[in-house]
Amino acid sequence: QEQFAQDGVPPAAAGVIAPLFTREIQHWAPQIVAWAAEFGLDPNMAATVMQIESCGDPNAVSSAGAQGLFQVMPFHFASGENMQDPETNARRGMAYLAQGMQLTGGDTGLSFAGYNGGHGTAAKGWGAWPSETQRYYTWATGIYKDAATGAGTSETLNQWLAAGGASLCQQAAARLGIQ
């Protein structure tokens, strides 16, 4: 009998990310698998966060000041750490995502919401979330469900790309030298 997580999504095959992620995310696949394993996370969950946050651009910076592959806020780093170093950024991002999984009893949706809006905000429920966190939850849970079930494509990912994600991915591809 197949094991399912609390939210009904089966765990990913060990050591891989789903083929539905964009080429910019696939570029980082071996590292994503290693980073996720270090924190006991499903690599598809980590890939989902990277997809939405930076589309694989290690030098991405948001208007709010979040930086790097996982768009981690500066206060999560120790003094002197390079926030855009992929290894450092991933470890800080994965630690925060793993904290969300612990706080929510393994609820991936609430963990995604917490990653975006803060774990305290996520605990307040949908109605108290900013619209950005509601959108993030919708994108992340849809993409992750498709990825975790082994789908080769994701309608939710396509919707995210059409809603502006494609420009983020074009920027990432240029930075990574992907044609």
Predicted features and spans:
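Substrate-binding/active-site groove segments that recognize
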Residues: V61-E81, R92-A95, A113, Y136-A140
